Amino acid sequence: MANTKKTTLDITGMTCAACSNRIEKKLNKLDDVNAQVNLTTEKATVEYNPDQHDVQEFINTIQHLGYGVAVETVELDITGMTCAACSSRIEKVLNKMDGVQNATVNLTTEQAKVDYYPEETDADKLVTRIQKLGYDASIKDNNKDQTSRKAEALQHKLIKLIISAVLSLPLLMLMFVHLFNMHIPALFTNPWFQFILATPVQFIIGWQFYVGAYKNLRNGGANMDVLVAVGTSAAYFYSIYEMVRWLNGSTTQPHLYFETSAVLITLILFGKYLEARAKSQTTNALGELLSLQAKEARILKDGNEVMIPLNEVHVGDTLIVKPGEKIPVDGKIIKGMTAIDESMLTGESIPVEKNVDDTVIGSTMNKNGTITMTATKVGGDTALANIIKVVEEAQSSKAPIQRLADIISGYFVPIVVGIALLTFIVWITLVTPGTFEPALVASISVLVIACPCALGLATPTSIMVGTGRAAENGILFKGGEFVERTHQIDTIVLDKTGTITNGRPVVTDYHGDNQTLQLLATAEKDSEHPLAEAIVNYAKEKQLILTETTTFKAVPGHGIEATIDHHHILVGNRKLMADNDISLPKHISDDLTHYERDGKTAMLIAVNYSLTGIIAVADTVKDHAKDAIKQLHDMGIEVAMLTGDNKNTAQAIAKQVGIDTVIADILPEEKAAQIAKLQQQGKKVAMVGDGVNDAPALVKADIGIAIGTGTEVAIEAADITILGGDLMLIPKAIYASKATIRNIRQNLFWAFGYNIAGIPIAALGLLAPWVAGAAMALSSVSVVTNALRLKKMRLEPRRKDA
């Protein structure tokens, strides 16, 4: 190969030599390709002819075989974007770069998230490419105070606005002369006075628009800066032309439009300031989450307590937490007992009792006892850090509903410039033939009324505020896509154990004396069965002292048999009692049947071959489960329960909470198939679960909802995480989605409607340029302000909410 390039790809998913051989063979089948795949290093080295192939082709080939190519993700801060055309252009350019798998640019957060192949490109190249487009870019620094940076930028905008307003206000008086035929001092109408005021506004305050326009045009793009620069320049330089005519005596009453250019720039700066101020409020939820983090920790070193910064805590460190202090990091209690306020994580205001070996979560509040703990997760691995990461990703992601606005934004400015040019031609040739000024005014109005900003802000601002508000209530959406999909859900499938129920069996009924209970708990205390644990805990709550068993024997399918202090104990079902010739009184038999019908596990107890008690154990239904399911029904959503339990137990639980559809006796591997069956009926299905065996069903469902108290596998597989396990958050999540999508539609309707109506009105000459500029400035502000209404939304579902 005369013209060759070499690249190295990190491959994931290979398990043996057959994998590496398969990939190597497939790559080498491509023309002019020489590939070697190393299983040990998990790398593929590929030599190829760049005229025939590119790296993406090799990546696609590897992925088609079922393997992955390692991708790195970087977040970039971008400044200088003024409208949707800017963010769309940067996104388009990044996605065309070699080695970039996917790039999204968010105008609201002023950030880009880029997934790239490290063998082909790196973060510095991405930054350089953005800078070449005329914007400032840097790799996001998580330790940098973004709030103070934005506050400084906002202050800078305010100063420029004030200076521009002071210079423009005297010129504004001229507009009142035109509108209301007012008398004003001659100084205000003096061309030199107007020139002196308007020029610094145009070329010092407004220089940013020229710079932005130049950078965009140089790179083959166009944005809002182009519209503002062209529109205000037309007014300003026409005024210069008229002023020259006045100076050389060609006219005694020059038609000046200095006030138009200056007031336009001031109004646009005013709109941008209001927009930036409103946008800064959209990230409040994230700021509140960050403020929850502890700042320092008390570490035990050589027997002494030392306060250290939080970032110096390592896994395995021994920490001491006193009453009223925040738990610094995730960990496990090794000494002491206390109550922990976990409301920031679960929303539950009642403190949770914690003892030795219990886990504690960083940033929760220690209420009343000094504890010693071992750090198990620190830094970015803590529960709060993961919550913040999920919220950040959701707020910077794009919803599919945004695609139309993105497409239009890419063509918006050139179309508007074309309409403005056409307006000028029509006016000067047909409407007012040969008269320059009306044509100029109408075309300037078209240029300045058009607003690509409103289009670009319509979706991301709503997503930011909506996901932030949801996070404040313990609902974590993993992205805008899932916010949009959730509002379409018409069927919710709930796993039973750990989702509808607490997942921990407890004693619900006991008939017998304390001696029988003591013997029963002693017999069960060495068993690892969850039912045995429930019985032992029940006895401990009664403060009974457990002794030791002399003999113990499990009777498969029947129960247990034990000897304790010369007492013979039998615990089990009817069959066990019958086999030992122990008769059941009718009332005991009726109780047993009643418990079993309610889905409880009932056990008979006999001491020395005499029936002495009956105990029932069940996995109890969660608080508010019934209310949550009623709310879902009120919203017009069908609710089903999916469980591996037998039908009787499942029906009993379903009856308690008001679920009509029960899918029972399902093996874990069959859960995903049951979801698919519902989807084949045309239903949009959400699956709610908490265990490892729920993960495939969570992935298969249109929306997977994980209970935050569940396993990491389930949470990773889900699209939404409900913190704390309160089922009332499920209808709230759906309502948050519906409210956010409704808000986005309002924003898009306003953004599209404003431009569709405003541009023709301006072209007809019905709006003065300064009125058009004011309308443009306020259009994007109105979109952001409407999105901010979501901050106050009450997550209370409406009946049959559409």
From Swiss-Prot:
Stretches assigned to the HMA domain: 5-70, 72-138
Keywords (A to Z) from UniProt: ATP-binding, Cell membrane, Copper, Copper transport, Ion transport, Magnesium, Membrane, Metal-binding, Nucleotide-binding, Phosphoprotein, Repeat, Translocase, Transmembrane, Transmembrane helix, Transport
EC number: 7.2.2.8
Positions contributing to Mg(2+) binding: 690, 694
InterPro entries reported for this sequence: ATPase_P-typ_cyto_dom_N (IPR023299), ATPase_P-typ_P_site (IPR018303), ATPase_P-typ_TM_dom_sf (IPR023298), ATPase_P-typ_transduc_dom_A_sf (IPR008250), HAD-like_sf (IPR036412), HAD_sf (IPR023214), Heavy-metal-associated_CS (IPR017969), HMA_Cu_ion-bd (IPR006122)
GO cellular component, one term: plasma membrane
Bilayer-crossing regions: 161-181, 192-212, 224-244, 256-276, 411-431, 438-458, 748-767, 771-790
Disulfide cysteine pairs (residue numbers): none
Induction: Induced by copper and, to some extent, by ferric and lead ions.
Location(s), subcellular: Cell membrane
Membrane topology classification: Multi-pass membrane protein
Annotated Cu(+) 1 binding sites: 16, 19
Positions with a binding annotation for Cu(+) 2: 83, 86
Top class in the EC scheme: translocase
Domain of life according to the entry: Bacteria
Family named by the database record: Belongs to the cation transport ATPase (P-type) (TC 3.A.3) family. Type IB subfamily.
Name recorded for this polypeptide: Copper-exporting P-type ATPase
Taxonomy of the source species: Bacteria, Bacillati, Bacillota, Bacilli, Bacillales
Gene of this entry: copA
